[in-house]
């Protein structure tokens, strides 16, 4: 046969239909993910073996004992491999009570059916996360919780998904959150404030150590454990991590009646007594926590101004929370988010301290140095700058988690939820909605599922504990 009789085929992807190209990209992503996960797990497994061998090499003991530990480690790895192949689903958990609600998700107290263990289950609606371009934030939250070994960050045990939701199965902290405490107690003494702010400093410093910026530090996200100590949560909820389009909407100039309403609100707010301000803030606080916009009261001005920001933006938030603990309301609170934003941007004129509330020189100085320009903000050079401030004199930074907390939850059972606003969440369904809305087309659903590829996670150290599986 003459070589000219051969049919030469030149691959030209531009001639393929879009549906074919989409399938190719989808298949490519799935294959890449499969091998990446396999390699990552092999590397982690090998590193655990190396760490164990190095530890055993430094310990005294017989070779027989060391060999037993190595064999036990191998059995645990095999157990973990088997468990990794099982698929978790919503059916593996039963809801005890709804304990929290966000704009696009919920937090439930749940029990794992096969072990009886109690967890907090956070669910996020995938279509909303996808539509609102929250993919990076959702991934950042999951990745931080996976990487964290900090006692100051809520522990993540499992992450999984179905066609509707993303699920994070985390430790349940029965003491509620700092927002609930502030609503119940109005204000804290300086000693109590000192304790909580010191623990917040260490918690934020740990987040920064892992290479993250929280950007949404607020009382709602500071949880209280059974011993009264704090842990940070919510590293990517839609009500936090303000995006550029949200910031831009705040910056639109107000016209017509809107300006007059804002001016009237400010006039009324300025004539309120401290007691009235506190009551007004408490009345509106829960509503703002549940809204799609959230509350900007604790956000640093540089985040709104899109000037670029660093880890020190979290220290501004700490100053705003400290103000609320001592005064009874945040420093820039208003009747609406636009007014709050305006006040934060113009903080030099709007940051004032009420004359009828006594503050020590040290407390006032610390707040002034936290809520200031980023260039001069305390903590810009690291958490040590804040830890050395005179307000924290007497704090045992190395052992603060071992000291008695000023408030220890009085719990009647491991499922006690009376520190959560469960009465306000009665309208939330007992079980998450499991049917896909008719308005969601199959192509969007397929894109959404592909976007969250790799979200699943199971914690090795926890799963291999005795009785954890």
UniProtKB/Swiss-Prot annotation:
Keywords carried by this UniProt record: ATP-binding, Kinase, Nucleotide-binding, Phosphoprotein, Serine/threonine-protein kinase, Transferase
Active site positions: 216
Domain AGC-kinase C-terminal: 393-467
Disulfide linkage: none
Biological process according to GO: cellular response to salt stress; cortical actin cytoskeleton organization; establishment or maintenance of actin cytoskeleton polarity; intracellular signal transduction; maintenance of protein location in cell cortex of cell tip; positive regulation of establishment or maintenance of bipolar cell polarity regulating cell shape; positive regulation of exocytosis; RAM/MOR signaling
A Pfam family hit: Pkinase
CDD domains xref list: MobB_CBK1, STKc_NDR_like_fungal
Binding-site positions, ATP: 99-107, 122
Residue ranges of every copy of the Protein kinase domain listed in the record: 93-392
GO cellular component, one term: cell cortex of cell tip
A Gene Ontology molecular function term of the record: ATP binding
Known catalytic reactions: L-seryl-[protein] + ATP = O-phospho-L-seryl-[protein] + ADP + H(+); L-threonyl-[protein] + ATP = O-phospho-L-threonyl-[protein] + ADP + H(+)
EC number assigned by the record: 2.7.11.1
UniProt subunit comment: Interacts with mob2.
Function: Interacts with pak1/shk1 and coordinates cell morphogenesis with the cell cycle. It is essential for maintenance of cell polarity and is involved in mitotic control.
Family membership: Belongs to the protein kinase superfamily. Ser/Thr protein kinase family.
The protein, known as: Serine/threonine-protein kinase orb6
Annotated gene: orb6
């Amino acid at each position: 046969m003459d070589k000219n009789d051969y049919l030469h085929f030149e691959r030209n992807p531009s001639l393929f239909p879009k549906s074919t190209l989409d399938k190719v990209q989808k298949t490519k992503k799935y294959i890449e993910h499969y091998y990446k996960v396999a390699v990552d797990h092999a590397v982690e497994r090998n590193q655990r073996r190396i760490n164990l061998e190095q530890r055993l090499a430094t310990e005294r003991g017989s070779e027989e004992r060391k060999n037993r530990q190595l064999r036990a480690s191998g059995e645990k790895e095999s157990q973990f491999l088997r468990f990794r192949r099982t698929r978790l689903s919503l059916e593996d958990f039963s809801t005890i009570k709804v304990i929290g609600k966000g704009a696009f998700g919920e937090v439930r107290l749940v029990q794992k059916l096969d072990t009886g263990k109690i967890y907090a289950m956070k669910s996020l609606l995938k279509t909303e996360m996808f539509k609102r371009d929250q993919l990076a934030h959702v991934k950042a939250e999951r990745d931080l919780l996976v990487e964290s070994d900090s006692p100051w960050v809520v522990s993540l045990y499992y992450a999984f998904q179905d066609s509707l939701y993303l699920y994070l199965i985390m430790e349940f902290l029965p003491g509620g959150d700092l927002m609930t405490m502030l609503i119940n107690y109005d204000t804290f003494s300086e000693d109590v404030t000192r304790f909580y702010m010191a623990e917040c400093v260490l918690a934020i410093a740990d987040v920064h150590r892992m290479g993250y910026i929280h950007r949404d530090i607020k009382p709602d996200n500071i949880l209280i454990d059974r011993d009264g100590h704090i842990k940070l949560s919510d590293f990517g909820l839609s009500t936090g991590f303000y995006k550029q389009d949200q910031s831009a909407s705040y910056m639109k100039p107000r016209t017509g009646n809107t300006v007059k309403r804002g001016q009237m609100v400010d006039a009324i707010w300025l004539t309120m007594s401290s007691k009235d301000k506190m009551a007004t803030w408490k009345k509106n606080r829960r509503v703002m926590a549940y809204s799609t916009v959230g509350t900007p009261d604790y956000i640093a001005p540089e985040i709104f101004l899109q000037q670029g920001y660093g880890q020190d933006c979290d220290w501004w938030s700490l100053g705003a929370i400290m103000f609320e603990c001592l005064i009874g309301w945040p420093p820039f609170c208003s009747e609406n988010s636009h007014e709050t934003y305006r006040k934060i941007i113009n903080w030099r004129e709007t940051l004032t301290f009420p004359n009828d509330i006594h503050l020590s020189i040290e407390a006032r100085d610390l707040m002034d140095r936290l809520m200031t320009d980023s260039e001069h903000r305390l903590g810009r050079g690291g958490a040590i700058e804040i830890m050395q401030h005179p307000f924290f004199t007497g704090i045992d930074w190395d052992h603060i988690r071992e000291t008695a907390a000023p408030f220890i939850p009085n719990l009647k059972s491991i499922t006690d939820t009376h520190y959560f606003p469960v009465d306000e969440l009665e309208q939330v369904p007992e079980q998450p909605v499991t049917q896909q809305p008719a308005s969601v087309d199959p192509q969007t659903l397929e894109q959404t599922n592909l976007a969250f590829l790799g979200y699943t996670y199971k914690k090795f150290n926890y799963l291999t504990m005795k009785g954890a599986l």
